[in-house]
Amino acid sequence: MKGTFQPSRIVRKRRHGFRSRMSTKMGRRILNRRRAQGRRVLCA
């Protein structure tokens, strides 16, 4: 049985990247919350 994490840079960027976050209302909320926390990295 293989592990659960099968790395793929394309899938990572598409699912968790900045543009996918900006494309939904909830995603923008995530970004704003991370900005408020003072995160250096906002998303993948």
Curated annotation (Swiss-Prot):
<dbReference type="GO" id="GO:0003735">
    <property type="term" value="F:structural constituent of ribosome"/>
</dbReference>
<keyword id="KW-0687">Ribonucleoprotein</keyword>
<dbReference type="GO" id="GO:0005840">
    <property type="term" value="C:ribosome"/>
</dbReference>
<dbReference type="Pfam" id="PF00468">
    <property type="entry name" value="Ribosomal_L34"/>
</dbReference>
<dbReference type="GO" id="GO:1990904">
    <property type="term" value="C:ribonucleoprotein complex"/>
</dbReference>
<keyword id="KW-0689">Ribosomal protein</keyword>
<protein>
    <recommendedName>
        <fullName>Large ribosomal subunit protein bL34</fullName>
    </recommendedName>
</protein>
<dbReference type="InterPro" id="IPR000271">
    <property type="entry name" value="Ribosomal_bL34"/>
</dbReference>
<dbReference type="InterPro" id="IPR020939">
    <property type="entry name" value="Ribosomal_bL34_CS"/>
</dbReference>
<comment type="similarity">
    <text>Belongs to the bacterial ribosomal protein bL34 family.</text>
</comment>
<dbReference type="GO" id="GO:0006412">
    <property type="term" value="P:translation"/>
</dbReference>
